[in-house]
């Protein structure tokens, strides 16, 4: 049986190498890169075309609310994945979560649906305004 250290050590090494490599490349680019500011480099980039209007426009609050709701429900969907993987026995000795895991995740999913219904009833997802 592998110990947790033996299991997570390769992941830690890869993470450490990735962080060191990223900071090394950023540092080298900062030290060795040319610094020639120009007007073209400071203009906002819009899909390869010339900018139309100002880049400092106000957006409606609805866009931010929808973005926050997307992040919240996306993170909650990420929490569902490990539960789905661990719910049933794997045939190699792991007994699965059983009924307690099923009931607890049922409560979690019910809370998600209740939150979605609440948001829907509040009219947050209504774009008619």
Swiss-Prot record:
Catalytic activity, EC: 7.1.1.-
Instruction: List locations, semicolon-separated.
Output: Cell inner membrane
Q: Drop me one GO molecular function for this one.
A: NADH:ubiquinone reductase (non-electrogenic) activity
Q: Read off the PANTHER family from this record.
A: NADH-QUINONE OXIDOREDUCTASE SUBUNIT A, NADH-UBIQUINONE OXIDOREDUCTASE CHAIN 3
Nucleus: present as a keyword of the record? no
Q: What does the UniProt keyword field contain?
A: Cell inner membrane, Cell membrane, Membrane, NAD, Quinone, Translocase, Transmembrane, Transmembrane helix, Transport, Ubiquinone
**Chief subcellular site?**
membrane
Query: Which InterPro entries does this one have?
Result: NAD(P)H_OxRDtase_bac/plastid, NADH_UbQ/plastoQ_OxRdtase_su3, NDAH_ubi_oxred_su3_sf
- According to its UniProt entry, what is the function of this protein? NDH-1 shuttles electrons from NADH, via FMN and iron-sulfur (Fe-S) centers, to quinones in the respiratory chain. The immediate electron acceptor for the enzyme in this species is believed to be ubiquinone. Couples the redox reaction to proton translocation (for every two electrons transferred, four hydrogen ions are translocated across the cytoplasmic membrane), and thus conserves the redox energy in a proton gradient.
Q: Which HAMAP family match?
A: NDH1_NuoA (MF_01394)
UniProt source species:
Anaeromyxobacter sp. (strain K)
Superkingdom in the source lineage: Bacteria
Catalysed reaction per UniProt? a quinone + NADH + 5 H(+)(in) = a quinol + NAD(+) + 4 H(+)(out)
Enzyme class per UniProt: translocase
Where does the chain cross the membrane?
A: 9-29, 68-88, 97-117
Q: Which GO terms describe its cellular component?
A: NADH dehydrogenase complex; plasma membrane
Q: How does it assemble?
A: NDH-1 is composed of 14 different subunits. Subunits NuoA, H, J, K, L, M, N constitute the membrane sector of the complex.
Q: What is this protein called?
A: NADH-quinone oxidoreductase subunit A
What is the protein's membrane topology class?
Multi-pass membrane protein
Which family is it part of?
Belongs to the complex I subunit 3 family.
């Amino acid at each position: 049986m592998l110990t947790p250290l033996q299991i997570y050590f390769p992941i830690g090494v890869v993470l450490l190498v990735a962080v060191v490599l990223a900071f090394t490349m950023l540092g080298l680019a900062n030290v060795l890169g040319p610094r020639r500011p120009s007007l073209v480099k400071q203009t906002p980039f819009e899909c390869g075309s010339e900018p139309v209007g100002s880049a400092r426009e106000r957006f409606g609050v609805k866009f931010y609310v929808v973005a926050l709701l997307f992040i919240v429900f996306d993170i909650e969907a990420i929490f569902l994945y490990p539960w789905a993987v661990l719910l049933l026995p794997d045939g190699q000795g792991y007994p699965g979560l059983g009924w307690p895991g099923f009931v607890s995740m049922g409560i979690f999913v019910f809370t998600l649906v209740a939150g979605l219904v609440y948001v829907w009833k509040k009219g947050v997802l209504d774009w008619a305004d």
